Amino acid sequence: ARLGLFPLQWTAALQDKLDTRLADVSLSVPEERHAEAPIWFSGAAAKNIHLLLDDTGLQALFSNLLKCAIDRDRQGKVHPAFIKIIEALSPDDARFLSLHSAIEPLKEELTSQVRNPMRELIRRRIPELDELPQAAIDASIDNLRGLSVVHSSVSNIVGLDRGSVTRVELKLNQFGRNFCEVCLPDSTDDDL
């Protein structure tokens, strides 16, 4: 009998967790600034409400997006694609994006020959990612590029007085900066 009731108990526990998180979102926006979320946002948010139950780091991004969507003063910053971006991120992608945005843009001029200039740039500028396998970092960069959040460039400059130089850069584009401003943890709490 207990096993038969498990699905109902589990569903009730999820509902309680969801209710708590939605209440937290609502309470974080001053009452005088509360607004109904745009209709184009509400449907997509409802389809992806599972992101609010995620405990891998994506929950904070979705929660901040919801805060902006119901905040009259910040609604204009919300873009329909932000939900899809969060849905397409791995926890490693979210962590990489958070660390990258804090020291944006990443730029280096490498005078020594390195096999993978982008990897060297990340190794030098974001040492917090050293514990991640290089394949995970490469996948995160590729995914963020594919989502049109970051732009990267690698160019070789020959003939300078110090020999050949490889200029490598990874930066958020304007869309990526907007996404970070709206969705990254603590970015929406500063002006509440």
Feature map (PLM): residue ranges:
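Charged, alpha-helical interface segments at or near domain boundaries
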Residues: 1-89
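Short amphipathic alpha-helical interaction segments
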Residues: 36-42, 127-158, 165-167
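Amphipathic, non-membrane alpha-helical segments in soluble helical-bundle scaffolds
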Residues: 55, 94, 134-137
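Generic structural signal for hydrophobic core residues of well-folded globular domains
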Residues: 65-69, 86-89, 100-104, 144, ...
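Short amphipathic alpha-helical interface segments
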Residues: 79-129
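Short, amphipathic alpha-helical interaction segments positioned at domain boundaries
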Residues: 161-192
